């Protein structure tokens, strides 16, 4: 009797920021595309509603309200006529427009596990791109590093998808001392006004939570997914004694003696910040997918999709 082997853990390839036409970058993206499609084949079947089950853009039939339904979808006419609360089901558009807001601030140029957070952000963007690319769906991106913002118009086609991902992967590092501003990047998605679609926010969300208002405005019109990319050192400090640490965005360098008390304080503060981030995102009506550099990111995506689908099926029973 032979023991079954555990599935191999998948790690994102290093994108090695460089020239957009670098053959090595193109090869890394092709490898990533094949990996995503092989791992998730049969999970979504090209259906974007499998990623974020929910309403589309066009009104459909009404049904009885169930706890957890979005009150913005209330069908007041049917509710008044029947004296029972009803919600209007929405029909998904045949063609979906997906916009990625990708945070490439200096805090993502960091990683102590299998890759940098930057690589994980590119991998997450690639997964969303390949999963939402069927049926004439359009994809676009806003990439921000705090000093500059690059906009890739939403278009269709495999060549466009690869160009968009290469643009994300080669976004230059911000100059020293420049902090990212996620609120500005999210707010840029509102102009010009777009048809209803999907907005995916990819960030480590480590900065101030000053992006709630623009995120809420986006969520009022689009389906939103937030993807959090983290490294173990974002949530806990190593037990290594004296160290010199540098703030990736401000450039400030400080010496620390990491003792148990400091580790506990850091862990509590990190946990509190992550809880605030999750609470704020869910308060805007968006789900949160957490990916880490020390975990199998594709397995985490599969679990997220499965959980969302179970919730969608339960809501329709």
UniProtKB/Swiss-Prot annotation:
**Domain of life of the native organism:** Bacteria
Which Pfam families does UniProt cross-reference here? DUF58
Q: Which SUPFAM superfamilies match?
A: vWA-like (SSF53300)
Bilayer-crossing residues are none
Can you list the GO cellular component terms from the UniProt entry? cytosol; plasma membrane
Family listed: To M.avium MAV169.
Q: What is this protein called?
A: Uncharacterized protein Rv1480
């Amino acid at each position: 009797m032979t023991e079954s082997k555990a599935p191999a853990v998948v790690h994102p390839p290093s994108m090695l920021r460089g020239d957009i036409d670098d053959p090595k970058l193109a090869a890394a993206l092709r490898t990533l595309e094949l990996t995503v499609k092989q791992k998730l084949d049969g999970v979504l079947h090209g259906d974007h509603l499998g990623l974020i089950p929910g309403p589309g853009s066009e009104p459909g039939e009404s049904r009885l309200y169930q706890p957890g339904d979005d009150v913005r979808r209330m069908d007041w006419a049917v509710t008044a006529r029947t004296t029972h609360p009803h919600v209007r089901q929405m029909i998904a558009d045949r063609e979906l427009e997906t916009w990625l807001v990708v945070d490439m601030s200096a805090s993502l140029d960091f990683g102590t596990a299998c890759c940098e957070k930057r690589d994980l952000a590119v991998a997450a963007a690639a997964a969303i791109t390949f999963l939402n690319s069927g049926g004439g769906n359009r994809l676009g991106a806003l990439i921000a590093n705090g000093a500059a913002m690059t906009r890739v118009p939403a278009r269709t086609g495999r060549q466009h998808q690869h160009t968009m991902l290469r643009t994300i992967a080669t976004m230059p590092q911000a100059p020293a001392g420049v902090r990212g501003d996620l609120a500005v990047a999210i707010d840029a998605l509102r102009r010009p006004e777009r048809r209803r679609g999907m907005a995916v926010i990819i960030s480590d969300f480590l900065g101030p939570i000053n992006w709630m208002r623009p995120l809420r405005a986006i969520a009022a019109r689009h389906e939103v997914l937030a993807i959090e990319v983290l490294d173990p050192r974002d949530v806990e400090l190593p037990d290594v004694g004296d160290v010199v640490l540098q703030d990736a965005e401000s450039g400030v360098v400080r010496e620390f003696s990491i003792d148990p008390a400091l580790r506990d304080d850091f862990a509590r503060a990190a946990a509190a910040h992550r809880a605030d981030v999750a609470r704020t995102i869910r308060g805007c009506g968006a789900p949160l997918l957490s990916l880490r550099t020390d975990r199998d990111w594709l397995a985490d995506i599969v679990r997220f999709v499965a959980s969302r689908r179970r919730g969608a099926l339960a809501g329709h029973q």
